[in-house]
């Protein structure tokens, strides 16, 4: 219940703008300005109680408290490490980022790319921080986390060994913005060791809020040049690199003056007419040095004399140091990898860019209810969350004669790095996209069933199921309606996720789920309608007061169930019996009369029939995945969120729902629906309750 309330509160705050870059969420409710002012007034330096300078902040295994790698480590402030520490000197450069004893080169490569764009860097690293003016030992940074911007506060105590920084550091040793940024990122992920191993695209996304895709240039898609052109038009960040095969290869220079292991940026893509044929050219920037390409289409290459002079002047006019052109074919031959970080519309302040249309949807997989696994598990796959994608407008320009709607889908699993210290790691995740059949077009209130997925193949799917934070793919499909199904590879894996869809044109996206519905059987009978046989049975069971209490009901039902071989049960708990009596006790006596007991008896017989029919494996019990079908048979339709709550409340640790809990669930639901209907006679879908009424209904 607390989790549901927290989600509702968070959704309301997000609707009011909390989590945007201008209104970043304060991580762990720590307010940078308030904490700094407190320290300045008290004349003390900040010590972060939420990420203290202790061994557990370093790691849990390789960097754990008893690891040899962490012996002799001292936490020191920059003022204790060098005589004149600086936060940032003359802007951020690559030399500010040198790797230490942590396997987070993926993160450092993303930080290096961040330094190429001052506007985006300033969003992540507020530059008005220093070790001189208003210094209080506290610094702050902003990261994108699963759809919202978060402000993270850290103190400036950094791990050192033999007087040197243990992790990231600047080349000259007196600049500390990168070390403090790494510490803030370690804090939000649980510890430094949680940063070991990852993809540069992950860092790209957390620094920009964009959606990052990458391409192996040895196997490029046929339309890659067009993808690059469109990405540049949209203001995306593009980086490329040449793989290294050994540590000795790092910074090695090829015979045509390209540097291996270097982060280059792609800044242009043009087609020019040369000697009667079209040539595709790529402009590359080497931000770190004077080394420039000496192959075809370099600055002094005769090939420039083969194109129109005005075109040559436009393309060769220098804008940035270290920029050079090369043919697209040489680009594919010499470089290994291209990364594109597609930025969100709010990141781009200029109106010159063609901006993506962005939609984000949050969801979760819950063991026993909505964690159905992949298509290899047909009995449960359909239980996964489902999302409708409605593509309406085709792209403005066709690629290679192919029309359609271009969109990117990124599925991110949340908070998995933070859970590494608890022994958890990344799930293996992926997704499928299914075409909606004509008969279901326009409907968003139907969760597609098991039979649909048994008879329909995926129109598209993620390239692979993989244990990375994000699975991302680019698609092009005709206008129409499609269902996106995200899943873990195996069923029963708990996890939270967010899905982001970047589309060329405006498209409609929303969760597909069953609407809440209760078709309850009404009993319009009088005592005169009850046959004599049942009257005699009731008189025998009820005793002298001619009424049945919850305790008497428990005894009666235990005897009945003991005779059933097809339902495993130890009888009903007194709690279930009290709920049944409350549901039908119309006169408030706390007991059931003849008519009330007759209605209950009829309901229990119906419940037994449903339970038996749903139990297809004849185990005498029901598993949590069968519960959804059972609820439908009983007249209830529920969205995924309610199924998660029901399984969490009524299933045991083996995901079994026994007959007692099955009946308790149905009776509880029926009672709640009847209360709501009584308080909402106009069927508005909302009711108002004061605190005492809310509490009375909640403790039913």
From Swiss-Prot:
Activated by 200-1000 micromolar concentrations of calcium and inhibited by calpastatin. Ca(2+) 1 binds at residues 658, 661. GO terms for cellular component: calpain complex; chromatin; cortical actin cytoskeleton; cytoplasm; cytosol; dendrite; endoplasmic reticulum; external side of plasma membrane. Residues 2-19 form a propeptide. Ubiquitous. Its EC number is 3.4.22.53. GO terms for molecular function: calcium ion binding; calcium-dependent cysteine-type endopeptidase activity; cysteine-type peptidase activity; cytoskeletal protein binding; enzyme binding; protein-containing complex binding. Residues 515-529 are annotated as: Linker. It is found in: Cytoplasm; Cell membrane. Ca(2+) 5 binds at residues 542, 545, 547, 552. Residues 345-514 are annotated as: Domain III. Gene3D superfamilies: 2.60.120.380, Cysteine proteinases, EF-hand. Ca(2+) 4 binds at residues 292, 299, 323. It comes from the Eukaryota. Keywords: Acetylation, Calcium, Cell membrane, Cytoplasm, Hydrolase, Membrane, Metal-binding, Protease, Repeat, Thiol protease. Its cofactor is Ca(2+). One of its GO terms (biological process) is vascular endothelial cell response to oscillatory fluid shear stress. Calcium-regulated non-lysosomal thiol-protease which catalyzes limited proteolysis of substrates involved in cytoskeletal remodeling and signal transduction. Proteolytically cleaves MYOC at 'Arg-226'. Proteolytically cleaves CPEB3 following neuronal stimulation which abolishes CPEB3 translational repressor activity, leading to translation of CPEB3 target mRNAs. Belongs to the peptidase C2 family. Forms a heterodimer with a small (regulatory) subunit (CAPNS1). Interacts with CPEB3; this leads to cleavage of CPEB3. Interacts with PIDD1 alternative open reading frame protein altPIDD1. This is Calpain-2 catalytic subunit. It comes from Homo sapiens (Human).
């Amino acid at each position: 219940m607390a989790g549901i309330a927290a989600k509702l509160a968070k959704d309301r705050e997000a609707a009011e703008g909390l989590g945007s870059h201008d209104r970043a969420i304060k991580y762990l409710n720590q307010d940078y300005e308030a904490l700094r002012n407190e320290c300045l007034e008290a004349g003390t330096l900040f010590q972060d109680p939420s990420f203290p300078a202790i061994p557990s902040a370093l790691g849990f295994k390789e960097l754990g408290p008893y690891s040899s790698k962490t012996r002799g480590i001292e936490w020191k402030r920059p003022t204790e490490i060098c005589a004149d520490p600086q936060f940032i000197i003359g802007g951020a450069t690559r030399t500010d980022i040198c790797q230490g004893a942590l396997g987070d080169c993926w993160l450092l490569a993303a930080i290096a790319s961040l330094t190429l764009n001052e506007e985006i860097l300033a969003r992540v690293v507020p530059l008005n921080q220093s070790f001189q003016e208003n210094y209080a030992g506290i610094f702050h940074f902003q990261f994108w986390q699963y759809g919202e911007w978060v402000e993270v506060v850290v103190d400036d105590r950094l791990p050192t060994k033999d007087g040197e920084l243990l992790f990231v550091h600047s080349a000259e040793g007196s600049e500390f913005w990168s070390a403090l940024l790494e510490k803030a990122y370690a804090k939000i992920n649980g510890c430094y060791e949680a940063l070991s191993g990852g993809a540069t695209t992950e860092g790209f996304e957390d620094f920009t809020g964009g959606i990052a895709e990458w391409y192996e240039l040895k196997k490029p898609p046929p339309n890659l040049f067009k993808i690059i052109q469109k990405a540049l038009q949209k203001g995306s960040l593009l980086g490329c690199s040449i793989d290294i095969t050994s540590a000795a290869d790092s910074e090695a220079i090829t015979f045509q003056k390209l540097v291996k292991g270097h982060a280059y940026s792609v800044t242009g893509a043009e087609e020019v007419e040369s000697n009667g044929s079209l040539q595709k050219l790529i402009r590359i920037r080497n931000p770190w040095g004077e080394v420039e390409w000496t192959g075809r289409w370099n600055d002094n290459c005769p090939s420039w004399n083969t194109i129109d002079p005005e075109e040559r002047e436009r393309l060769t006019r220098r804008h940035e140091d270290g920029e050079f052109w090369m043919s697209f074919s040489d680009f594919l031959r010499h470089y290994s990898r291209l990364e594109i970080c597609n930025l969100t519309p709010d990141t781009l302040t200029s109106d010159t860019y063609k901006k993506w249309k962005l939609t984000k949807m949050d969801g979760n997989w819950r063991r026993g209810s909505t964690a159905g696994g992949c298509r290899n598990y047909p009995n449960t796959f359909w239980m996964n969350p489902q999302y409708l994608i409605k593509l309406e407008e085709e792209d403005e320009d066709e690629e290679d004669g192919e029309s359609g709607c271009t969109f990117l889908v990124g599925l991110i699993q949340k908070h998995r790095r933070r859970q590494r210290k608890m022994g958890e790691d990344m799930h293996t995740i992926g997704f499928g996209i299914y075409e909606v059949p004509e008969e279901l077009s326009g409907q968003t209130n139907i969760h597609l069933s098991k039979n649909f997925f048994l008879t329909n193949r995926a129109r598209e799917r993620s390239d692979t199921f993989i244990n990375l934070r994000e699975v991302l793919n680019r698609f092009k499909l005709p206008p129409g309606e499609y269902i996106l199904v995200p899943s873990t590879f195996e069923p029963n894996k708990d996890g939270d996720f967010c899905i982001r869809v970047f589309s060329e044109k405006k498209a409609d996206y929303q969760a597909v789920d069953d609407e809440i519905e209760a078709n309850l059987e009404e009993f319009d009978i009088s005592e005169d309608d009850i046959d004599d046989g049942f009257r005699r049975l009731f008189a025998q069971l009820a005793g002298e007061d001619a009424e049945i209490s919850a305790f008497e009901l428990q005894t009666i039902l235990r005897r009945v169930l003991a005779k059933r071989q097809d339902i495993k049960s130890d009888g009903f708990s007194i709690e279930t019996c009290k709920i049944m009596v409350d549901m039908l006790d119309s006169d408030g006596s706390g007991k059931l009369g003849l008519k009330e007991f007759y209605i209950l008896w009829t309901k229990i017989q119906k419940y037994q029939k449903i339970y038996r029919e749903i139990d297809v494996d004849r185990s005498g019990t029901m598993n949590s995945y069968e519960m959804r079908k059972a609820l439908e048979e009983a007249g209830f339709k529920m969205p995924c969120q309610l199924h998660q709550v029901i399984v969490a409340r009524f299933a045991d640790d083996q995901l079994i729902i026994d007959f007692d809990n099955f009946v308790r669930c149905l009776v509880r639901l029926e009672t709640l629906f009847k209360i709501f209907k009584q308080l909402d006679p106009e069927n508005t879908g909302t009711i108002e309750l004061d605190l005492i009424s809310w509490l009375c209904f909640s403790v039913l």
